[in-house]
Regions:
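General small-molecule cofactor/ligand-binding pocket signal
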Residues: 32, 78, 139
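Residues at the C-termini of beta-strands that transition into short coil/loop
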Residues: 35, 81, 142
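Acidic, PIN/NYN-like endoribonuclease modules and their adjacent C-terminal/linker elements
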Residues: 1, 68, 113-142
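Active-site neighborhoods of divalent-metal-dependent phosphate/nucleic-acid chemistry enzymes
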Residues: 75-125
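Active-site-proximal, substrate-binding regions of enzyme catalytic domains
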Residues: 42-91, 133
Length: 142
């Protein structure tokens, strides 16, 4: 099982830079992500629609593909538990002031750590640099 953040999940459906490498990695194992990654993923597609990067018909196809894959169990969506939220609070208590960590990225990192993952895959430099504060190794194949 491999933990992907949303920046990697989007590349499974949209031809952003590095999509081929991410898809090859995804084909090698089952995928997991924090449950809120579903909202982040469709929000990323909506942003592409809003920015004019995709047309409404393509947007509808993307959303349909995501829904079909979710219903088929293509991803393990990990719900946020009290333990995950506690871990986030504790991480921020100890986090050096120099570390830039968004709340949604902290949810990814704490979810991965509490679920027993040792690595997280992302293209987000802030998430990758903060991974060590959750006992994780951040990896990027792009």
């Amino acid at each position: 099982m491999i933990y992907f953040d949303t920046s990697y999940l989007v590349r499974l459906y949209y031809q952003d830079p590095g999509a081929e490498a991410v898809r090859a990695l995804a084909a090698s194992d089952h995928l997991a992500c924090a449950a809120h990654g579903q909202a982040e993923m469709v929000a990323a597609f909506h942003r592409k629609l809003r920015d004019g990067a995709i047309r409404p018909a393509s947007y509808a196809v993307l959303i349909g593909q995501v829904e079909a894959h979710i219903k088929a169990g293509a991803f393990r969506w990990i719900p946020q538990s009290a333990e995950i939220l506690f871990r986030i609070r504790k991480a921020y208590e100890k986090l050096p002031a120099s570390v830039f960590l968004r709340a949604a990225d902290a949810v990814h990192l704490a979810t991965a750590a509490e679920s027993g993952f040792r690595e997280v895959y992302s293209n987000d430099l802030h998430l990758l640099s903060a991974a060590k504060h959750f006992g994780l190794v951040g990896k990027n194949v792009i």
